[in-house]
Swiss-Prot record:
This is Palmitoyl-monogalactosyldiacylglycerol delta-7 desaturase, chloroplastic. A motif (Histidine box-2) lies at residues 185-189. GO terms for cellular component: chloroplast membrane; thylakoid. Pfam families: FA_desaturase. Residues 1-67 form a transit peptide. The gene is ADS3. Fatty acid desaturase involved in the first desaturation step leading to the formation of hexadeca 7,10,13-trienoic acid (16:3(7Z,10Z,13Z)), the major functional components of thylakoid membranes. Required for chloroplast biogenesis at low temperature. Also indirectly involved in the production of the oxylipin dinor-oxo-phyto-dienoic acid implicated in wound signaling. The lineage of its organism: Eukaryota, Viridiplantae, Streptophyta, Embryophyta, Tracheophyta. One of its GO terms (biological process) is unsaturated fatty acid biosynthetic process. It comes from Arabidopsis thaliana.
Length: 371
């Protein structure tokens, strides 16, 4: 059992309720160990898997053994899920190497959370309206439409003035400048749910949710220095945003204070930023733990309806990992995808061009196949 799991090939844990599925050849072959769970398995009382199946780049290799190790403590179950991952040695937070950027990230995230705690004492409807409006502007237009679908995946093209405007909206979400955000996300897709993934639940739910942001040394060890964003680094506008990044949210805070005083700061900055933080982070954590898989992506990505509702369609995450180039994540008519509706509107008025969608042939290649 131990020798099987230590080989440099993806490994999946499969339940007796469903037969093992063949790893789709569209998934890149990587040198890592991967633990997953069965397709469409519903939450139920914990039962150890009955077999282990090892995959290689050539497809399914039926090296099957009993999952005795799963009952002997080699695996742990991720919180409130049916996902089993191999146990790793825990790194004590305060004993690891901390860099200045780590302290800075903790300070920013903590200060926004503390500021949001004042919301009940600074409530007024104008401030709430401003927070909601900025949630749309920074969350939908900035993060999901610009940083994610446009810049990270090139799912469509926009006129440069509009591309830059939406990217500026994303910078106001206080999640990092476009170059760094896009680099991390591209590495996530390249090394998805492996030991080199910047934020995988293989390292625990909370690591994938937020703790990864406070450990730049680990991310550098996994991914190396960012070298996958040359398309953005060659553009002066994005280099400018990287250099001056923190000044832009500060300028917005000053403007909000001038418009509505401290309540606008609490709601328009604190509450809104924390809300968009956790919605974005849930895509990295919850959507790799809770939900269903519609496509044979060979990773832990899930379709999660409630994250999709909060994150403007980003919760259809298994769809996204199956067709990362697609401007549309909610592929079924009933899958709400507000970001796609905005892209579709921009396309209708001639502002979005080269809008990419998966073909029927591509869908067939990513579909689960019966044994």
């Amino acid at each position: 059992m131990a020798s099987l799991l230590t080989k440099p090939k993806p490994v999946f844990l499969c339940s007796p309720s469903l037969s093992p599925r063949t790893l789709n050849t569209a998934t890149p072959s990587l040198n890592f160990t991967r633990i997953s769970f069965t397709h469409h398995q519903k939450l139920a009382p914990f039962k150890p898997p009955s077999l282990v199946v090892a995959f290689s780049e050539k497809g399914l290799k039926r090296d099957v053994t009993t999952a005795a190790a799963a009952t002997e403590g080699d695996y742990r179950r991720i919180m409130l899920s049916d996902v089993l991952v191999k146990k790793k040695e825990k790194v004590v937070w305060w004993e690891r190497e901390w860099k200045a950027m780590d302290f800075g990230a903790v300070a920013v995230v903590l200060s926004m959370h503390l500021l949001s705690l004042l919301a009940p004492f600074q409530f007024n409807w104008r401030a709430v309206s401003v927070a909601f409006g900025l949630y749309i502007v920074t969350g939908l237009l900035g993060i999901t439409l610009s940083f994610h679908r446009n810049l990270s995946h090139k799912a469509f093209k926009l006129p440069k003035w509009l591309e830059y405007l939406f990217a500026y909206c994303g910078a106001q979400a206080l999640q990092g400048n476009p170059i760094d955000w896009v680099s991390t996300h591209r590495y996530h897709h390249q090394f998805c749910d492996s030991d080199r993934d910047p934020h995988s639940p293989l390292d625990g739910f909370w690591f994938s949710h937020m703790n990864w942001m406070f450990d730049t040394n680990t991310i550098t060890q996994r991914c190396g220095e960012p070298n996958n964003v040359g398309d953005l680094e060659k553009q002066p506008f994005y280099r400018f945003l990287r250099t001056t990044y923190i000044l832009h949210p500060l300028a917005l805070a000053v403007a909000l204070y001038a418009m509505g005083g401290f309540p606008f700061i609490v709601w328009g900055m604190g509450v809104r930023i924390v809300w968009v933080y956790h919605i974005t982070w849930l895509v990295n954590s919850a959507c790799h733990v809770w939900g269903k898989q519609a496509w044979n992506t060979g990773d832990l990505s899930k379709n999660n309806w409630w994250v999709a509702a909060l994150a403007f369609g980003e919760g259809w995450h298994n769809n996204h990992h199956a067709f990362e180039f697609s401007a549309r994540h909610g592929l079924e008519w009933w899958q709400l995808d507000m970001t796609w509706y905005v892209v579709k509107f921009l396309q209708a008025i001639g502002l979005a061009t080269d809008v990419k969608l998966p073909s029927e042939a591509q869908k067939q290649r990513m579909a689960f196949t019966s044994d």
